[in-house]
């Protein structure tokens, strides 16, 4: 990632700290992956703090595929089978079956309905019967070890929530341009400025975690 583009958001460690602070205060962040990977920016919000307005923003400016990033423990708690037995996707994106809240939604498509589904899935006492399958929210299972195991947006989302002291569940959606094409670094940065959202990279987060673990040892 071209660090010059991101320099106005601080150095790598500062970018992570600003993102964590934003998440603690209920704001969203934008996460870029490597230019030689997907080279995309995702809008990411804390699942427990996300508002209907933020969900509407996500649907309006995103790909429409609103994903809920979960730990393996939560996936098992909800008894969500993986979408396929053999994952042949290029980046091994770990989708489970899609979900809908069993109560409190109509068609499940609206911003409010999708948020109701997410809140049902992350509730402390959530059980499998709280969710219908299929639905309009796409759960993703994060790899244990986070970005140190897999450098994906799913793992970055769960890592950010954990580091921020929040529930280890987050909502992500790929940012798109008005013409439907995927947003890359310049467009992501412009969107971030317009909506007062911090920007960081998965590379930043990897370095931050490595430094923290080295310091702890």
Swiss-Prot record:
MF terms in GO: 3,4-dihydroxy-2-butanone-4-phosphate synthase activity; magnesium ion binding; manganese ion binding
In which residues is Mg(2+) 2 bound?
38, 153
- What are the binding positions for D-ribulose 5-phosphate in this chain? 37-38, 42, 150-154, 174
Keywords, in A-Z order: Lyase, Magnesium, Manganese, Metal-binding, Riboflavin biosynthesis
Cited Pfam families: DHBP_synthase
Gene Ontology BP annotations: riboflavin biosynthetic process
Q: How does it assemble?
A: Homodimer.
Metabolic or biological pathway:
Cofactor biosynthesis; riboflavin biosynthesis; 2-hydroxy-3-oxobutyl phosphate from D-ribulose 5-phosphate: step 1/1
- One GO cellular component term: cytosol
**InterPro entries recorded for this chain?**
DHBP_synth_RibB-like_a/b_dom (IPR017945), DHBP_synthase_RibB (IPR000422)
Q: Which residues bind Mg(2+) 1?
A: 38
Say which species the protein is native to. Answer: Pectobacterium carotovorum subsp. carotovorum (strain PC1)
Question: What does the record give as the organism's lineage?
Answer: Bacteria, Pseudomonadati, Pseudomonadota, Gammaproteobacteria, Enterobacterales
Q: Which EC class, in a word? A: lyase
Q: Which cofactor does it need?
A: Mg(2+); Mn(2+)
The cofactor note from the UniProt entry for this protein is:
Binds 2 divalent metal cations per subunit. Magnesium or manganese.
Q: Please give the function described in this protein's UniProt entry.
A: Catalyzes the conversion of D-ribulose 5-phosphate to formate and 3,4-dihydroxy-2-butanone 4-phosphate.
Q: What is this protein called?
A: 3,4-dihydroxy-2-butanone 4-phosphate synthase
Give the family, as the similarity comment puts it.
Belongs to the DHBP synthase family.
- What are the site positions for Essential for catalytic activity? 136, 174
Its Enzyme Commission number(s) read: 4.1.99.12
